[in-house]
């Protein structure tokens, strides 16, 4: 199973190499500081491939691993800038120019620091009207709240989750949705996460679906049972009917749908003709299949909005776009709609840049 860790190890090695050359080119006097930095990155690699599993307390393990990845990523981002600066300095070694260009090399590292320290702590309340042709009149104005990708861990505390739960509850939604990834790994406080989510209030109930991180630790059933004790119903390839006036809302949820396998198998039969059909799926990759099956609205998360995102000329640039076109926002295909939230937490690198955390309030509007 070593192959599972190869991408992470490649990232760590690339980060260490980039840090080595950046120090050699621009900070030769600070070479003694380089070795502890590279050692810290190496420790993160050992923790990631579980060579020290159990020897380090869970919070320390997750913290060191996350910060090591953040440092490696910052060095990788700064490296191409460093190459360009080095080339320019060879052409014109003016001392003032050198200082300005060296500051440019530090910019990606400083940005990563901001993403770790500040940008991931302040969730936004994103409000959006979803205009849906043919929406039953009794569903017009229905308020749907969504919270997703919590990843409760040393990098997102219970107190921060409580703040997000309060934001959702204050909107007084008709239905609240929890769309997966409550935690990241087996050593994260799943029970605490569900206990905090139990404070969610919605007039017609709180519903959820599971994400890939519950699947990774085989915790879907445990989390579902515990959540049910707190009044939260996780739908695992199941449906429920919610009545609003003379209209039915047919709500369904699915467990995580792995890429490369058939999507939404056995789910088409849960679509109810002449009702508004809403599907919860952690991954937005199901959308094309859902559209073919007749789902009116899909609520998803999973992508974190790219997590490390750069907006350039109106385009969102991030690694997630290499894997899915559904990175963030509202999408329409035929009569079907998809909403993808940026969610709350982080995974891998404990930073958010250009993709602030959020909770969502969506209003159904008759088109």
Place the predicted regions along the sequence by residue:
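Non-catalytic terminal accessory segments
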Residues: 1-121
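Soluble catalytic domains of enzymes that build or remodel membrane lipids, polysaccharides, and related
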Residues: 135-367
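N-terminal signal-anchor transmembrane helix
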Residues: 88-107, 114-146, 153-166, 170
């Amino acid at each position: 199973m070593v192959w599972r860790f190869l991408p992470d190890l490649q990232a760590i090695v690339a980060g260490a190499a980039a840090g080595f050359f950046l120090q050699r080119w621009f900070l030769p006097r600070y070479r003694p500081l380089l070795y502890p930095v590279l050692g810290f990155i190496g420790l993160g690699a050992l923790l990631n491939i579980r060579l020290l599993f159990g020897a380090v307390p869970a919070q320390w393990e997750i913290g060191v691993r996350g910060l090591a990845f953040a440092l490696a990523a910052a060095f990788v981002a700064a490296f191409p800038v460093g190459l360009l600066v080095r080339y320019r300095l060879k052409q014109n070694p003016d001392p003032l120019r050198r200082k300005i260009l060296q500051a440019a090399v530090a910019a990606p590292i400083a940005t990563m620091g901001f993403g770790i320290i500040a940008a991931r702590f302040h969730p936004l309340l994103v409000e959006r009207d979803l205009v849906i042709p043919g929406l039953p009149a009794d569903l017009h104005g229905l308020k749907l709240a969504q919270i997703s990708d919590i990843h409760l861990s040393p990098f997102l505390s219970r107190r921060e989750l409580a703040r997000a739960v309060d934001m959702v509850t204050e909107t007084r939604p008709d239905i609240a949705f929890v769309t997966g990834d409550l935690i990241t790994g087996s050593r994260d406080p799943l029970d605490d996460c569900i206990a905090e989510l139990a404070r969610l209030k919605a007039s017609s109930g709180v519903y959820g679906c599971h994400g890939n991180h519950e699947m990774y630790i085989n915790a879907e059933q445990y989390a579902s049972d515990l959540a049910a004790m707190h009044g939260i119903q996780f739908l695992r390839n199941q449906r429920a009917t919610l009545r609003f006036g003379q209209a039915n809302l047919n709500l369904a949820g699915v467990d995580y749908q792995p890429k490369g396998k058939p999507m939404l198998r056995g789910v088409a039969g849960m679509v109810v003709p002449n009702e508004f059909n809403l599907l919860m799926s952690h991954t937005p990759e199901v959308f094309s299949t859902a559209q073919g099956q007749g789902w009116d609205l899909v609520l998803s998360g999973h992508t974190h909005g790219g997590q490390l995102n750069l907006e350039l000329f109106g385009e969102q640039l991030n690694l997630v776009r290499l894997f899915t076109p559904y990175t963030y926002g509202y999408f329409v295909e035929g009569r079907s709609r998809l909403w993808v939230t940026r969610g709350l937490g982080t995974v891998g690198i404990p930073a958010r840049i250009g993709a602030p955390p959020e909770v969502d309030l969506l209003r159904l509007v008759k088109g």
